[in-house]
């Protein structure tokens, strides 16, 4: 069966003029002027008209499907995939990445956006108000400046509770150097992203942080005698003192807009992680933190940029640095004549130590090591004891409670080494 195609206005005009030329009612020169073609091309059109008739004036691609056009079955498959429950909150850019990675369907962003829009499927971002971020130039070297922050969000489908994602991002390359999720913004989260950064990338020159009391003191506390003798001019936070030990310059950001790099990262991860967690059936923080270790590599491979300077400002972590003792909350305590001390109304005895009464010790607290005592560069274990008879009591919940209070809760407040 012969397929007929309708001519558009230009093709109809061209056919009419060439017919006049063939019939002798118009010269080649007149046809050339009227159509804006060369006389040589008009002669070719005359020859084609004589041989094939008016249909030869149709464009050569008429009725031909473009090579890039997707077949109906593939379009339907894309729609079926998009309508799956785990993709109900995915934006267009992320969905394009998922199609390529998971289903081996490669389409352009513009096609996918228009195709979904025609089928009344809009990106979740379409309904949001656009935030204006004043961009500044990136630092020239990786490791020259890192931005640190935490963001609360409902990351798990069907769970209305908010969980806080802690993160570090390199300003020059846009690479994530650490991600860790906790219930609230806390020292534990910041300890873990620092551990990831120091191990996998090295020690950066500086870190850009907001004015949180985790990073900076918010009141003019009186200096301890030790601090005055050492020449310290103002109090420092637990996190700040760790940065000083590492030689990292901690810079205070004036506003959230000043940390634009990490604010944009949060916008991206709020969208993507919800979908990624649904796809991978992740429903709690422990599973999420395991997943995030590999997700950092995936994200960096896709989104990192090449810094202006190939030389890195990161320096290797000294082998002598023990991260398990460095990334801890530290408190000064004085022991009694039984090698005991108290912390948060709980008494502890230091195990296997020969120490004089009234000696000052460092108490180290973290999720990684629990509660330990550092004395003469050596770590000692401790046990909770009864105040009445100085006998050890098996109450691991006491230790867990103190760790939780100092690492997950108290460290949201202004905590100094005391």
For each of these PLM feature ranges, what is it?
Residues 2, 8-9, 28-81:
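Short, basic alpha-helical/linker "hinge" immediately adjacent to a nucleic-acid-recognition surface
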Residues 17, 42-45, 53, 78, ...:
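Mobile genetic element proteins and their domesticated derivatives, centered on retroelements
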Residues 21-23, 86:
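Short amphipathic helical patch at the helix-1/turn junction of helix-turn-helix
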Residues 57-154, 226-234, 312-319, 323:
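Basic, flexible linker segments flanking DNA-binding modules
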Residues 101, 105, 117-176, 183-205, ...:
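Mobile-element integrase/transposase regions
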Residues 201-231, 312:
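Acidic/histidine-rich, metal-coordinating catalytic segments
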Residues 232, 238-308, 314-325:
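Charged alpha-helix within mobile-element recombinases
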Residues 296-418:
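C-terminal, beta-rich DNA-binding module of retroviral/retroelements integrases
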């Amino acid at each position: 069966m012969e397929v007929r195609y309708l001519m558009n206005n230009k093709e109809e005009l061209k056919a009419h003029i060439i017919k006049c030329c063939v019939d002798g009612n118009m010269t080649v020169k007149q046809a050339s002027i009227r159509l804006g073609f060369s006389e040589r091309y008009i002669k070719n059109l005359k020859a084609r008209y004589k041989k094939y008739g008016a249909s030869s004036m149709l464009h050569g691609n008429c009725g031909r499907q473009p090579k890039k056009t997707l077949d109906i079955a593939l379009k339907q498959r894309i729609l079926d995939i998009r309508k799956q429950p785990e993709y109900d909150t995915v934006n267009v850019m992320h969905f394009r990445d998922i199609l390529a990675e998971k289903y081996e369907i490669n389409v352009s962003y513009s096609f996918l956006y228009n195709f979904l829009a025609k089928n009344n499927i809009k990106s979740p971002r379409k309904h949001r108000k656009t935030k204006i971020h004043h961009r500044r130039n990136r630092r020239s070297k990786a490791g020259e400046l890192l931005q640190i922050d935490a963001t609360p969000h409902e990351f798990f489908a069907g769970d209305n509770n908010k969980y806080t994602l802690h993160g570090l991002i390199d300003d020059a390359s846009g690479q994530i150097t650490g991600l860790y999720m906790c219930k609230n913004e806390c020292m534990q989260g910041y300890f873990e992203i620092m551990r990831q950064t120091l191990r996998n990338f090295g020690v950066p020159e500086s870190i850009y942080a907001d004015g949180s009391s985790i990073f900076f003191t918010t009141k003019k506390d009186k200096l301890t005698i030790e601090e005055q003798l050492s020449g310290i001019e103002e109090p420092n936070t637990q996190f700040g003192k760790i940065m000083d030990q590492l030689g990292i310059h901690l810079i205070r950001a004036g506003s959230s807009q000043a940390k634009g790099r990490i604010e944009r990262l949060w916008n991206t991860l709020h969208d993507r992680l919800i979908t990624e967690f649904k796809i991978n059936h992740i429903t709690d923080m422990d599973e999420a933190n395991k997943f995030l270790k590999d997700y950092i590599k995936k994200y960096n491979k896709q989104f990192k940029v090449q810094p202006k300077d190939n030389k890195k400002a990161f320096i290797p972590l000294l082998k002598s640095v023990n991260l398990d003792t460095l990334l801890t909350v530290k408190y000064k305590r004085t022991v009694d004549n039984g090698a005991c001390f108290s912390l948060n109304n709980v008494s502890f005895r230091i195990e296997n130590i020969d120490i004089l009464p009234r000696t000052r010790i460092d108490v180290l607290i973290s999720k990684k090591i629990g509660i330990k005592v550092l004395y003469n560069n050596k770590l000692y274990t401790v046990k909770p004891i009864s105040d009445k008879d100085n006998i050890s009591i098996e109450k691991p919940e006491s230790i867990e409670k103190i760790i939780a209070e100092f690492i997950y809760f108290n460290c949201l407040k202004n905590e100094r080494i005391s």
